[in-house]
Amino acid sequence: MKLDELLVVAAAQWPHKRALIFPESELTFSNLHANAKRKARSLIGAGVQAGDHVGILSLNLPEYVESIFATNMAGATAVPLNARYRGAELKRVIADSDIRLLFTTSQFDGRVDFSAHLTDCYPELSTALNPSQLRIGEAPLLKSVVMFETTQKLGFISST
């Protein structure tokens, strides 16, 4: 059974039971399934196809888990990225992983600002006129960077 199929079964058997518990939020299996399905449809709408690689660069958040399930539902491969990567490490793993779309967060824990790290790695993000069709020489397959939250940052798409 694939990962996304496990969520479908869990949502059917225990729709109102807690699937995720975070300090500031909880999600039931039904909520997790609905959120993951919505993200999966968005991935497909963004052109992600079966076999594509979707990166996830984030703190431990409900959206992180939703993105893993959504990526599997869309038939793509989730590529969780180490939140401690910076500069050359981050650039290398994004390019070497053939990531087409990258989920990230603007949430800042006092140590990590992912949008700043990504903009440092890829200055093209700060001038991108069409953030759904990025053209980054050092990451030629990367077409979109999607923030979990609403954002006004150039080069980033809001998932909300």
Regions found by a protein language model. Give the residues of each.
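Absolute protein N-terminus
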Residues: 1-2
